Structure formats: structure tokens, C-alpha cells
């Protein structure tokens, strides 16, 4: 590979340094490279590998199959290997198989995993394993029940291992039913059956039912959506976008997989745990299954994309076969309709997302690129910023901004090409089938009025939703901050005879609602935050849905809600001497005087 950068890091220096590191590599990295060195070798149609990990303490059905191999002398017709966890009791293995045992760390073990036509395993597979085309991977489970396999546990390789399975045997009917019928596992692995000893009554039945089992393609009835969450930088913002996307999918038509690093703390884990129950979660663990030379080439590019002089040329040097082998390790052979990337910059995760086979690849760019550019104060940081923008446009079909302004300034400053940029507003329902158009949604089953669009400095756009009282009831609103609490509640309690609801506006609204429990009307009170309604450019349209405005006490200060209700011709109600009546006094004599005041004090209430 030619040198691609003008900085001190040359490819030859990098390669020499990395070769030394890889020579001393241990654990999964070492085994993954050994496996990768053998990955291109052809499958041996007469090789059978039994893989028992340290977790397979009682895998009776798998052991019975091994015993049957001995009984019918299948070990004389097939090349048999047993990769055996170091912590397992070797007495579990039939004596005739003792001579075939290999330790997972043996070099021969990685070659056998890469070349075996048949791989029979228990609960686990190696983290670096990728099922090759034509390779028959048959799994045996003693139990696989929901209570023992929550989705965070499944995320730790188990889901990927299922995806790389062509057939699954379970020891009990409950597990077979759970894997076959549970929506979380549908369209993942191959066929599932409860293990029956009938299949090992003769040599012919073993060969026909296990060794010569036809590999059936998993049928996909839904469109697959893949979401990448890279390094967590702004947890609140990333969680918001993650929920925005996952809460508004039609899971009758969409199958959603979220892939991410394993959370480093309980807060992030809690975010993931409480996502929509239909979302399948996979933690990327392990390493690239590739040779040492391939690994060095990939790492060189990943670590230097920020400093390359020609990003497009560097991107063209990527060994996409190795990257796609890694995505196959995680997701199997499934094709995705859409790939969505959320989170902070990561060259690795960008490349992974860019190499997944999909119709559409989207990057959610929720930060203000102008600010990001301004914060890049050194020459190296400016190059890194520029290179990242170019890398994103090579890897993704669209860069999605949270508002029109961010999109337009990104195009104007040439951060992003016009044909690569689009935007949506928050919150929305994503319709990936209709040219990335979005529509508003109901929240928790209730209807809300769409309030102001508020742009945060960090790039998010909040679309405020204001509660709408139930149809058929009289609808009132009040400014809770300038009302006498007890008088207001007494007034509203009397109005309950007319079956009404009241929206409370202001910082003290929650306190008043708590007090309302004494009057038994707390369920008829709805709340709006002061900031949200004050900043709304849709306030008058919202107020038009109400029948009247209530106030109690001294309301001498300006109230934009009352002013809006007056100008809309709505009734203003007061209570005097225990009697509720209309108030004919006006805060503004006409609309013009209100507009003049409004323009002068715009920032105070909008």
C-alpha cells in the first residue's frame, strides 16, 4: 500500500510497529488473526468439529450425538475434532474422542473452525467466528428461556451466535417454542427443533438428519433497519434521537437491530434496557476475523483518516471484504433497507456502517457544524474536521440535520454537498419509505397540539407538544403564576358542574395540581411549562381551541395568555363574592396596541 499521508506516520513505520504488537498479541485478538489466516481455505466436506465452551457443563443432547458417532464408527469416515474448554471436565467426553481434543488456544483449533463443513456446538461460539457459505453450524441448547436470557445478556454475542446458526436443537419443548415463536428471535437463526434420540438410532439417520441437513435460507418478511450508536458523547441527546427513531417504527413491517459498544456504566445500560421491546440489541465485542496483514492495513486506515491528504483515495484502499466479514460476524447474511448512524465520531464505526449492504445509509448529524469547525483551532484539528466531513459523505448516502438552518449553513460553508444533505424536525415519525419524509405523532395515546420549534445551541430541535383537553368538555386555561391558588381551585371546582378541564400555565402549576387533590379535581388539570408556551409561535392557534380564560386574585401584570384570549374574542371569567361571572375589562384596547407591545417585549413571552 502506498503512503497516503505527509505526516510522520508512514505506512512502513506503522506496519513494522504493528507487526511487533501482533507477534505478542494474546487472547481473542491472537485467535482471531489465526482464524483469519485460515478463513480463505476451502471447507473440508469430511471434517466435523465439536465445539464445547466452558459454559457447556451439561449438554446432554450434544454428548449423545458424540457417543453415536463412536457407536457407528463415524469417526473412521469423518475427520473428527473436539475443541474443548479448559475449565470443562474431560471425563464428559467419550474416551474414543479424547485423542481428538484441541484447546481453543491451539493454532490447529482456529484452522479447524475455518475449514470444517460441520460445526456442532453448545451454548457458545468463538467471538471471532463467521459462518462461511456452505458451512453447517448446528447448535444444541439445554434451556433457552426468556427469564434466563434478557436482551442485555443476549446482546453479549448470543444474538450474533444465533444469527450464525443454520439449525438449532433444544432439549426441551419450551425452549424450542420460545426460539421459534418469540418475535425477538424470528428471522434470526435457521430451523429450531426439540432434540429427539430418534435421529441417532442409526448411522444413516445421523448422516441424513445432521450431517447432510440442507441449509435453509432464513426467510425475511420485514424490512431490516440497522442502527449504529458509536461512542456516547452527549448521552441525553443521543438517547433522545435513539428513542425518537425506535419509538416510531412500525414493527409489523420493520425489523430493527441496534449495534453498539457495551455500555460502560449503569446509566447507559438503563437507556438501552428501556428501549422499545422490539429492538434487538447487539454489543460489538471481539475483533476482526482477518489475517495479520489485513488487520494492519485496516488499522492503518482507521487510525489515520483524520490526517490523510486524500480521503477518497484512502477510502478506496479499504479492504471491504474484511469489513463485510466483520459485519457478517455480527449480523449474518441479512440485507438491510436502512442503516442509521447516531453518536460521536468514530472512524471504525463509520466504516462498519458504510460497508453494510443497504439501500440507504443515514448519518444523524445533530451538532452545529459551524461550532465544530470553530472549535478546531489548530491546523491538525481543522484537517481532521474536514476529513471527517468527507469520510461521512463517502460512507453515507445522506447526512441528516435536525433543522433547515443547520442543513443550509453546512451546504453554504461546503461542509456537505447539497445532494448529500437533508433534515427533519424533532420529534417526528420517521417514514423511511417516502423519501425520508416525516410526520407528527400522538404521544402516549393522547392528542397534542404542535407548539414551537426550539433550536438548541448543540444542534437539537425540540417540537413542543401542548395538551389538548378531551372532546366534549369545556376547555379553560389560566396563568397559575399570578392567581391566588385556593381561590382559583374553588372557582374551578364550582365550574365542574359543567364538565370542564383546565390547563395550568406557569412555574407554580405543578404545586397547584398537588393542592387540587384536596378538592378532588386533580385529574381535570393539565400542565404546560412556562418556557414552552411563552416561546411558542403557535400560541394563538393553541388558545383558539379553548372556551375561556380563568383568573383569580390580582392580575395587574401583563399576561400574554389573557391578551391572546381577549383578542380571539374568548370569554374571561372571574369570581366575585363566590359568584363566577364574565370580566369585561381589557388589557389592550385593540389588536394594534397589543402588537406594538408584543414586538417590544417579544423575548419575554415568545
Q: Where are these predicted regions, by residue range?
A:
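Conserved donor-binding/catalytic core segment of Leloir-type glycosyltransferases
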Residues: 45-54, 201, 222-231, 400, ...
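Nucleotide-activated donor-binding/catalytic signature segment of Leloir-type glycosyltransferases, i.e.
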Residues: 94-102, 275-283, 450, 512-533
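A conserved nucleotide-sugar
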Residues: 73-82, 252-257, 470, 489-528
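Conserved nucleotide-sugar donor-binding subdomain of glycosyltransferases
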Residues: 103, 151-156, 162, 298-347
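Aromatic "clamp/platform" in nucleotide-sugar-dependent glycosyltransferases that forms part
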Residues: 554
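Membrane-proximal helix-turn-helix segments that form the acceptor-binding/catalytic region
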Residues: 151-167, 326-331, 379-399, 544
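Active-site proximal beta-strand in glycosyltransferases
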Residues: 132-149, 353-372, 400
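A short, active-site helix/loop in glycosyltransferases that binds the activated sugar's phosphate group
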Residues: 168-186, 395-420, 428-456
